[in-house]
Design a protein with these regions (language model features):
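N-terminal mitochondrial targeting presequence
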Residues: 1-18
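N-terminal, positively charged nucleic-acid-binding surface of large information/translation enzymes
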Residues: 14-304, 371-384, 388-403, 439-481, ...
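Structured ligand/cofactor/substrate-binding pocket environments in proteins
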Residues: 39, 98-111, 118, 126-127, ...
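Acidic, turn-prone loop/beta-hairpin segments
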Residues: 127, 221, 228-236, 739-765, ...
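Core structural elements
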Residues: 173, 196, 509, 700-702, ...
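Residues immediately within or flanking Cys/His clusters that coordinate Zn2+
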Residues: 217, 433, 452, 965-968, ...
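Short cysteine-rich clusters marking metal-coordination/redox-active sites
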Residues: 220, 455, 526, 568-573, ...
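C-terminal low-complexity, glycine/proline- and small-hydrophobic-enriched intrinsically disordered tails
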Residues: 716, 845-994
Length: 994
């Protein structure tokens, strides 16, 4: 007796599963999870290298077929080729998430363009010169060896470091599924690239744009080189020791000032200035005022009745002047005839007061201490008035004592080391302020927190220092550069104003660097007078030819034995009176001329005789490149061509990478997430293994125009989303294996099939719109919504009964499989640009019979989007009728007794006054997922039937009730005449199989 219930359960279980083998259950080799080893070894080569090379070779073949028809070639390029220019990453260290963000965004764009019928040219690059790599090379030497290491040795070690970094980064990039040819990158330290760069420089020389001047430049004291504005970052919380300092007017100037003020006292007058850089006071050579302002003479009643001069509005705001008495006011122009002295220098030189438009009355005193060697505005005013430029500071940021008066030497020497003081040391500011106090020049001092430029590499504050440097004159270039941007499409739009403002505010570009690792500035200097330089169009062209023959390292072998080789023949007799310069070009000039790679591709490989209007369709980099690569690319291209045309048609920018707390990823903070940690996971940090597709999904789902966050929470959401994609594809592929492989025409499809295809068509239109807007996150959102609502919750669920239980050759099953194939084709097309290895895995699992081997192979490479032309009526008809019925069915089903848990346990009656009702009972049963539908035409509705009014005026009545029949042990629909007996449909299916 005790065993009977158990036996009954076993018998019941056996009954329910006795027919499982007769069902057409999904079968596919498509895995539940991705396999990283297979992805890297098989799927990436198939979906990246093979595709890129195949499509490019097809394009090159089409070009070759056109022979010498240059116009036809140009037309083919402009209409059919899509070019995205790679901004070269720096060849130093491992890749971080920012690299993945950048490269994957580019790849998504390229793949989408390929799917729209374009051919793709995308050549990856590496930026190899510059200070960080040189510093890595120098670290291999002991400090006492550094002064003895030759430039050639430094360059060899730097080159070796860069090559190792490129090899490492290439391997890491290879896991991102980027569609390109990694064996053919451009590298800025390769000979041909350097020659091309020098040719651009030659063009700028020929246009008179390259000049040498002793001007103030930003200077990195740690790195000991000049810096461009793009190499700076600003510390908003920098602290300086600020001081209000008095400079005495000469006796004669005091008299003139009193005369202008119409007073006749006998007293000294000082000019009150404010500075945040007391160390520059030794370089003071003028004081600037603004002739538009009014200035007050204030008497210090506590100091013998002497006077100070301050701008009128600011005089009211300076608290330490509270005991000073206003005596008179004079116009700014009254100061123009005056002179003063600088007691710090211990001389009696009378120095000028000069008008300056840069002088404001928003801070300070309205009188500006002017040191032409340490300030840009200072230099400009001094240059216009022929005031000397001095900068007694060396490359390390120490005072040059030999250029300062002897009485200052002891004060400005460190007692412990005996070295000149560092100008930025707080102790230096203290001794200077103490000296000012003793001399009676210090009126007040205070700590001042403000924004200050830092070297972006060393993270140390910079100074402004006048040194002889080479500059590109931008006065005649920036107008064309700004005009060129008017024709460029920016995404996001704000990028236009940002890039334009950077160019507009730039009059020159300091392109020389005092380093060994870089492309040389091909200038020659007189041995007996280094201020005399030789660099003409002729000499630069000759140097380029010599470098092509001897190699670029030959320039850096600084001996006199072969100077005649480096200069044109007409300089043979005087060649030995010159020596070669040691300066190298700013690395932004290196990478900024990367458009040469495209120029060579068009002219040399495609053999075009005319370049397309825009060399690249897209430039895409981080938002910081408005100051860097975007700017240098625009300036060099416009300066070279002499035309207001940028090298890019569209410019796209992305943000920085943050952790989930909104904090910028930083090694020092310890919140950096590497691409490898995203791909393989990191259990110690709670990071799930997302694989290659997960890394790409993480990038695509972000709003990349703002800063992009990554972390455990976001990554777990990505893992769930990927799981849903794989489940959807498993369903599609699993139900496309057992088939007759017959595709049914559209006219023969059911309303639910046509509705599903229309919704698929809608999805494609939506996705294409978002792709064209570079809004990849919305592409994914649209696909996920469609997958959840139109597939999983509707079509997939509706189709399962027929797919699993109908005969393999049933017409309805063929109808469904036809639609499933279209869903698969559309989904792989839509998400292919974002998840290429997932799509490749799907393609590999799809039976060839559905497409034919030739068609399958072509779609594998080009993956064009399916074309649909389905009328809107297909959607409206189904939505207005069948979906209305489904809503009412669900409402009534929810009110049934608790023992009724599945729609297959119910029967649905639909009554219509129309005769006949234009609906098929079997189709409605599938849609409602009920055991069966009974359609009744005419008759009086029962009270239990609910009225439904359709938009076309038809009135229906519906009743959902429990089925009185038994459960079929095969399909589980309650359509069997008795327990454990097959329903008629399943009985016929099995009988026909047999």
């Amino acid at each position: 007796m005790l065993n009977r219930p158990r036996c009954w359960v076993i018998r019941r279980f056996a009954s329910q599963h006795a027919y499982q083998k007769t069902l057409n259950l999904p079968q596919t080799k498509f895995a539940n999870r991705s396999n990283l080893q297979r992805t890297v070894n098989e799927l990436i080569p198939e979906s990246c290298d093979k595709i890129y090379k195949s499509q490019l070779q097809e394009f090159l073949s089409k070009i070759e077929e056109l022979g010498d028809d240059s116009n036809a070639k140009l037309k083919l390029v402009e209409e059919n080729l899509f070019v995205l220019q790679d901004g070269p990453p720096y060849a130093n260290g491992d890749l971080h998430y920012g690299h993945a963000l950048n490269k994957i965004l580019k790849d998504i764009i390229n793949r989408y363009q390929l799917s729209q019928g374009k051919y793709i040219f995308y050549k990856p690059g590496w930026d190899c010169h510059g200070l960080p790599i040189e510093m890595k090379a120098l670290k291999q030497f002991n400090p006492d060896q550094l002064g003895k290491v030759s430039p050639v040795k430094i360059r060899a070690m730097a080159s070796n470091h860069a090559r190792k970094a490129i090899k490492l980064q290439k391997e890491q990039f290879g896991k991102f599924a980027i569609m390109t040819d990694w064996d053919k990158p451009y590298v800025t330290m390769e000979s041909e690239y350097e020659i091309n760069q020098l040719r651009v420089f030659l063009k700028l020389v020929s246009r008179g744009l390259i000049k040498r001047q002793n001007k103030p430049v930003y200077w990195g004291t740690e790195t000991r080189t000049a810096l461009a504005e793009g190499e700076l970052e600003y510390n908003e919380n920098h602290k300086s020791k600020a001081a209000y300092v008095e400079f005495p007017l000469t006796k004669d100037s005091c008299s003139k000032l009193f005369e202008s003020a119409n007073i006749t006292p006998v007293a000294d007058v000082s000019l009150l200035i404010w500075t945040t850089t007391p160390w520059t006071l030794f370089s003071n050579r003028a004081i600037c005022f603004n002739e538009k302002y009014e200035y007050q003479l204030l008497r210090d009643n506590n100091n013998g009745g002497n006077y100070v001069v301050v701008e009128s509005n600011l005089a009211e705001k300076l608290e330490f002047l509270i005991n000073y008495q206003k005596v008179a006011a004079v116009s700014g122009s009254a100061l123009s005839r005056l002179q003063y002295t600088n007691p710090l220098l211990g001389d009696r030189v009378e120095r000028p007061l000069l008008h300056g438009d840069h002088v404001t009355n928003s801070a300070g005193t309205g009188l500006v201490h002017t040191a032409p060697g340490h300030g840009f505005d200072d230099y400009n005013v001094a240059h216009n008035h022929k005031v000397e430029v001095v900068s007694p500071v060396d490359a390390a940021g120490r005072f040059k004592l030999e250029e300062l008066p002897p009485h200052l030497h002891e004060l400005l020497t460190e007692h412990q080391t005996g070295l000149p003081r560092l100008v930025l040391e707080p102790s230096t500011a203290k001794v200077i302020l103490d000296m000012l106090q003793k001399m009676g020049m210090l009126c007040s001092s205070h700590d001042y927190t403000h924004s200050y430029p830092y070297d972006w590499r060393s993270k140390k504050p910079v100074i402004i220092r006048a040194t002889p440097q080479w500059f590109a004159d931008l006065h005649d270039v920036k107008g064309d550069a700004i005009e060129s941007l008017e024709k460029v499409k920016f995404y996001p739009d704000r990028g236009n104003a940002r890039l334009s403002s950077f160019i507009k505010n730039r009059n020159e570009w300091c392109i020389s660097r005092q380093r060994s690792w870089g492309v040389p500035i091909p200038a020659f200097y007189k041995k007996d007078d280094p201020d005399v330089t030789l660099m003409t169009e002729e000499t630069v062209a000759h140097v380029i030819q010599v470098i092509r023959e001897k190699g670029i390292d030959a320039w850096f072998k600084f001996d006199d034995s072969n100077m005649a080789d480096w200069l044109p023949p007409r300089y043979k007799n005087e060649a030995n009176s010159y020596y070669r310069g040691k300066d190298t070009m700013d690395v932004w000039f290196d990478s900024g001329t990367a458009w040469n790679e495209l120029k060579d591709f068009y002219l040399k490989e495609l053999k075009l005789k005319q370049l397309p209007t825009y060399l690249a369709d897209v430039y895409l980099e981080g938002s910081d490149q408005h100051r860097g690569w975007f700017q240098s690319s625009t300036l060099t291209r416009v300066a070279y061509s002499g035309k207001p045309v940028a090298p890019f048609k569209t410019l796209i920018t992305h943000g920085f990478t943050l952790d989930e707390n909104g904090i910028k990823m930083s090694k020092s903070i310890g919140n950096v997430i590497s691409p490898d940690a995203i791909i393989q996971g990191d259990k110690t940090r709670g990071l799930p293994a997302l694989g290659v597709d997960g890394l790409r999904y993480l990038v695509a789902q972000s709003n990349f125009t703002a800063d992009v966050a990554a972390g455990p929470v976001i990554m777990n959401h990505v893992a769930e989303a990927l799981k849903k994609f794989r489940l959807a594809f498993r369903f599609l592929l699993g139900n496309l294996q057992k088939a007759t492989f017959q595709k049914i025409s559209y006219d023969q499809l059911r309303p639910i099939d046509k509705y599903t295809l229309y919704k698929l068509q809608e999805l494609q239109i939506t996705a294409r719109t978002f792709y064209n807007e570079n809004n990849f996150s919305k592409v994914l959102t649209a696909v996920q919504y469609h997958m959840s609502n139109d597939l999983s919750a509707l079509y997939f669920d509706i189709s399962k009964d027929s797919l699993y239980s109908d005969a393999l050759d049933s017409f309805k099953r063929q109808q469904i499989q036809t639609v499933l194939l279209q869903i698969l084709l559309s989904y792989t097309a839509i998400i292919g640009p974002i998840l290429p290895t997932l799509v490749q895995e799907v393609w590999n699992a799809l039976p060839l019979k559905w497409l034919g081997e030739e068609e399958h192979q072509k779609l594998t490479v080009f993956r064009t989007w399916p074309h649909y032309d389905i009328p809107e009526s297909a959607k409206n008809s189904f939505a207005n009728c069948e979906l209305r019925l489904l809503d009412e069915f669900q409402r009534q089903f929810d009110t049934l007794e608790k023992s009724i848990t599945k729609p297959v346990q119910t029967v649905t009656r639909i009554r219509s006054s129309e005769c006949p009702l234009p609906y098929n009972e079997d189709e409605l049963a599938d849609i409602l997922r009920t055991a069966r539908v009974e359609i009744i035409s005419g008759g009086v509705p029962e009270e239990t039937e609910t009225e439904i009014s359709l938009p076309n005026g038809t009135k229906l009545h519906m009743l959902v009730r429990p089925s009185e029949l038994s459960k079929c042990p095969r399909c589980w629909k309650h359509n069997s005449s008795q327990e454990d007996t097959l329903c008629s449909r399943c009985n016929d299916t099995i009988h026909n199989k047999a």
